[in-house]
Amino acid sequence: MRLFTGVDLPERVHDRLERLLAVLRPTAHLIWSPVYNLHITTKFIGEWPEEKLDEMVTVLRRLPAAAPFTIALRDVGWFPGPQNPRVFWAGVHGGAALATLASTIEDALVPLGIARETREFAPHLTLARIRRPVPLQAMRQAIANLESFDFGTVETDRFHLYESRPGSAGTVYSKLAEFKLGESSSSGSSRRKGA
């Protein structure tokens, strides 16, 4: 199983992002992310044995309680930069609370043998990937003509454990477990999907 943890996006945010991508998709031949797949990754875990899934869920269930917080989604940009970009992204602004959630999850998973990230936590939504050089002038002009890059907010009171599976129509993300913030995990702050 290929796993990661993340924060889901509400439908109203999906709708705003879809309106943006409907304008931009025709302007450049990129590998565009399906809006329904967009999420805020807090920790990429990688391959994990299915028979040990309950062990991981138990560890995440024991995270210390954290207060719910708000994430703002706004702005767009390029990784690593506007020259020869590889990723087109939307900005995720969760402040210290989101960074703390990510580091708390990471710390909890280290005893399971999950390596720490070597790069600084940089939350974003991957809107498109660029595998080879393509003309971007029309896309840049379309971006310049847009008036707003405010995609709304996410009232974050939970995160999920996801499985990532390749499919014929692209990658499919499935929620395996849900973990609520603001409650101690021992009081039932998580549940296994389908349990």
Report residues per predicted region:
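Histidine-dependent nucleotide/RNA phosphoesterase domain, centered on the 2H-phosphoesterase fold
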Residues: 1-195
